């Protein structure tokens, strides 16, 4: 077995382990953040400051009975959470999480695969995760799951179009689909960040990301007050945990991608080294998603579709046209 294959396998194991742990810990952080906004304590009983709540929740998930509803399609019911997990982690392959570094005289590239269409790969594989809630809802033999599945089809496909069109303008400026090249394009300093050249694209992509991630206020797929848990209604135990973990893994992936594309990525930020800089940026966007959840109410499905097709899509197309004109001039 070649050194390249061994290195890649080690990177994959580290990536899955780290982001699985981060996904679990993010639940604790989110509950604490929401508690702060609502003037509550949040988790505080299990361990110091409630830090062991994550371990307690993990034990509960792994020991719960795995139930498959009567009349459900067992194969598809089991396949759906696997698709969610695989798409979330595979989409991270072209993301450069840190600058290159040397370990024991060997240069390490902290990404799985440096492909020249990295951004397209990220969007395409992430979009494949749309099949998870659709199949889960169709296979569950439950009316609430079916409604959640229908909402997933409409919402995720609609915003996939918007996010793809939105990101075309920054890619036109850089001239590359590689996330590594996009990062290097902004290496000149703070003012080279694409957020200053493409502020509209940043805002549109951030909103579309929240809709694709099923984050509040766009969590129509599993809105508790309307459809119980949506496509997840019949899931329990490990299968439910896989959906849950995939959602947080995708949140971290989008946070890193937004940091790389619009905020200079892992380039040094003043006196702050690049590795620490990208962690601060990605951490901020994870926190921002929690802040938005605590602040904004849910939107209705018709309001969401109106915003997508009547506001965001025309703005994305207008931004592409204006960017093309500016480049030609």
From Swiss-Prot:
Catalytic EC class: translocase
PROSITE patterns to which the protein is assigned, alphabetical: COMPLEX1_ND1_1
GO biological process, one term: aerobic respiration
Compartments where located: Cell inner membrane
UniProt membrane topology term: Multi-pass membrane protein
This enzyme's EC code(s): 7.1.1.-
MF terms in GO: NADH dehydrogenase activity; oxidoreductase activity, acting on NAD(P)H, quinone or similar compound as acceptor; quinone binding
Chief place where the protein resides: membrane
Gene Ontology CC annotations of this record: plasma membrane
Membrane-spanning ranges: 9-29, 42-62, 75-95, 117-137, 154-174, 188-208, 238-258, 260-280, 309-329
Domain of life: Bacteria
Recorded catalytic activity of this chain's protein: a quinone + NADH + 5 H(+)(in) = a quinol + NAD(+) + 4 H(+)(out)
UniProt entry keywords in alphabetical sequence: Cell inner membrane, Cell membrane, Membrane, NAD, Quinone, Translocase, Transmembrane, Transmembrane helix, Ubiquinone
Quaternary data: NDH-1 is composed of 14 different subunits. Subunits NuoA, H, J, K, L, M, N constitute the membrane sector of the complex.
Family affiliation: Belongs to the complex I subunit 1 family.
HAMAP family in the record: NDH1_NuoH
Functional description taken from the UniProt entry: NDH-1 shuttles electrons from NADH, via FMN and iron-sulfur (Fe-S) centers, to quinones in the respiratory chain. The immediate electron acceptor for the enzyme in this species is believed to be ubiquinone. Couples the redox reaction to proton translocation (for every two electrons transferred, four hydrogen ions are translocated across the cytoplasmic membrane), and thus conserves the redox energy in a proton gradient. This subunit may bind ubiquinone.
Name by which UniProt lists this protein: NADH-quinone oxidoreductase subunit H
Natural source organism: Helicobacter pylori (strain G27)
């Amino acid at each position: 077995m070649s050194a390249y294959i061994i290195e890649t396998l080690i990177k994959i194991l580290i990536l899955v382990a780290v982001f699985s742990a981060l996904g679990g810990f993010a639940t604790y952080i989110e509950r604490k953040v929401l508690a702060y906004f609502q003037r509550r304590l949040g988790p505080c009983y299990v361990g110091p400051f409630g830090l062991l709540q994550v371990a307690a929740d993990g034990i509960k998930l792994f020991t719960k009975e795995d139930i498959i509803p009567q009349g459900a399609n067992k194969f598809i019911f089991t396949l759906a959470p696997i698709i969610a997990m695989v798409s979330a982690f595979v989409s991270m392959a072209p993301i450069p999480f840190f600058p290159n570094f040397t370990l024991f005289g060997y240069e390490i590239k902290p990404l799985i695969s440096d492909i020249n269409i990295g951004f397209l790969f990220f969007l395409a594989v992430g979009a494949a995760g749309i099949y998870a809630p659709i199949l889960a809802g169709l296979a569950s033999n439950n009316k609430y799951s079916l409604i959640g599945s229908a909402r997933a089809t409409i919402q995720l496909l609609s915003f996939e179009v918007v996010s793809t069109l939105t990101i075309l303008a920054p890619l036109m400026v850089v001239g590359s689909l590689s996330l590594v090249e996009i990062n290097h394009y902004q290496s000149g300093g703070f003012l080279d960040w694409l957020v200053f050249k493409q502020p509209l694209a940043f805002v549109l992509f951030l909103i579309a990301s929240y809709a694709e991630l099923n984050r509040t206020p766009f969590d129509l797929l599993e809105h508790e007050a309307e459809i119980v848990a949506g496509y997840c209604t019949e899931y329990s135990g490990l299968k439910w945990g896989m959906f849950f973990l995939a959602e947080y893994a995708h949140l971290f992936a989008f946070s890193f991608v937004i940091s790389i594309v619009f905020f200079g990525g892992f380039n040094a930020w003043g006196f702050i080294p690049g590795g620490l800089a990208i962690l601060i940026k990605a951490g901020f966007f994870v926190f921002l998603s929690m802040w938005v959840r605590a602040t904004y109410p849910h939107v209705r499905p018709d309001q969401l579709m109106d915003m997508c097709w009547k506001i965001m899509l025309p703005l994305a197309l207008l931004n592409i046209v204006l960017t093309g004109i500016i480049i030609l001039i």
